[in-house]
């Protein structure tokens, strides 16, 4: 679960000029050497430790992977490829749990924002301060700000994508991350799914990986400096856990087996 080696093998089979380099982004000297040697035109930085829960158990590793390694990439760019473009896949978790403290309206199957100002979600100027992010959110936010800073300070073409729930047909999911794919897999295998708080009415903003790839392509074609984008599927593609249960069951014919943990998930 969560292993991406099969995806790599598929890429190697289907894309003739795909080249995989087994390189730990935490290794500063090797990252510097790679940039000096290869001099990439564009960098799409997707590497991450993606789990809230795991971050709390291994905070040093989480920060090294998410934050320090991003600095390795940025400084390598500055030294060897300052004209390159970098797209960093950040996360909406940079806003922490602050959105949960906005006034909410409870409906039968979901919560929605009561204030019409947030009818279509929150903007990029929403505060990232004085909120609980989870350690994962904090490490990703550190990298997010550093990408912006290298862009603004060194005039590096760059953006941070603060994505919703990215999903697609090749999503490698586990309980700790990969919401929609994991929920569907759990239903098909007739296993028990755990809901963490909020009565199962918490809403997830889902966006297909093809849409994310399309955005990245357009940004690289017309790059800007130090930009930030909230990238989601929009209200029409959002779904609460309760709603997802109903939708998946209508497709598979399997009733959702679940356990409700009343403790709200952090971040």
Task: Give residue spans per PLM region.
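C-terminal substrate-binding subdomain of Rossmann-fold SDR/epimerase-dehydratase oxidoreductases
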Residues: 23, 187-267
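N-terminal Rossmann-like NAD(P)+-binding domain of SDR-like oxidoreductases, especially those catalyzing
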Residues: 1-164
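Hydrophobic alpha-helix immediately C-terminal to the catalytic Tyr-X-X-X-Lys motif of short-chain
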Residues: 142, 146, 150, 183, ...
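Residue-level signal for the nucleotide or nucleotide-sugar donor/cofactor binding architecture
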Residues: 26, 57, 65-68, 134, ...
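A conserved pocket-lining segment of Rossmann-fold NAD(P)-dependent short-chain dehydrogenase/reductase
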Residues: 55-56, 120-134, 158-172, 182-207, ...
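A glycine/serine/threonine-rich, flexible loop-to-helix segment
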Residues: 101-103, 173-181
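A structural alpha-helix within SAM-dependent methyltransferase catalytic domains
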Residues: 35-36, 74-78, 148, 184, ...
